């Protein structure tokens, strides 16, 4: 157990962490382009120096299984302590589609995240990880499934979530994962950092100052809170996350 202190614009809590990164058999291994940590192509980082370039840039997503635990692992372009916690900048959600699950949802963690999950990725389990609140592991009804173990590793730029397969199940063919990364803000009702038309010290910008793209005129409170997602083949992140093209729906990556 490691204690995480309060600091900056963040809150603290006692965090249970795994003792190693885990491993086992690779179930799914997907890479994501470097430098697409701009949502639909226009999003900007907050201007405060606490927010380091690459902190919201997913570059890889892995699912592994050792028969006892399943491991969900993201790799980031940058993982550095922010507000006193190694994963203090990030808010990571993974929506898990399990074939045959009877109770599922396509809703985001909060309606104010401003996106939904595709019906093909309708989830029966959701994980949410951040540096300043206990990890969340719930089913589609909002009930706690179990206790996830979380390990951020700066040298590898990874955040690993270890889940007992007795509760999670053994991931395999047909399982889907909708992976969404945005910024954490413990002062926000949905735990996600807010957007403003252009970036503020502690808010993401929908566009840079002087931006002329159609999204630049959209109400910032209605844009999807997603700096980067893991997209399946043939899906453009810039298109998927653009609210001017219709409702924003996140597509899963699926185990063959």
Over which residues does each language-model region extend?
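Acidic/polar low-complexity flexible segments
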Residues: 21-29, 98-117, 168-256
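Localized edge beta-strand/strand-to-loop motifs within extracellular or lumenal beta-rich domains
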Residues: 153-169
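Conserved structural position at the C-terminal beta-strand
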Residues: 3-5
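Extracellular and select intracellular beta-sandwich modules with Ser/Thr-enriched
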Residues: 9-15
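Interdomain boundary/hinge segments at the C-termini of tandem beta-sandwich modules
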Residues: 16-20
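Beta-strand-rich interaction surfaces with strong enrichment in secreted/lumenal proteins
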Residues: 59-62, 146-152
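Surface-exposed, glycine/proline- and aromatic-rich loop segments on solvent-exposed faces
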Residues: 23-130, 184-189, 254-255
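Short beta-strand and strand-turn-strand segments in soluble, beta-rich domains
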Residues: 136-147
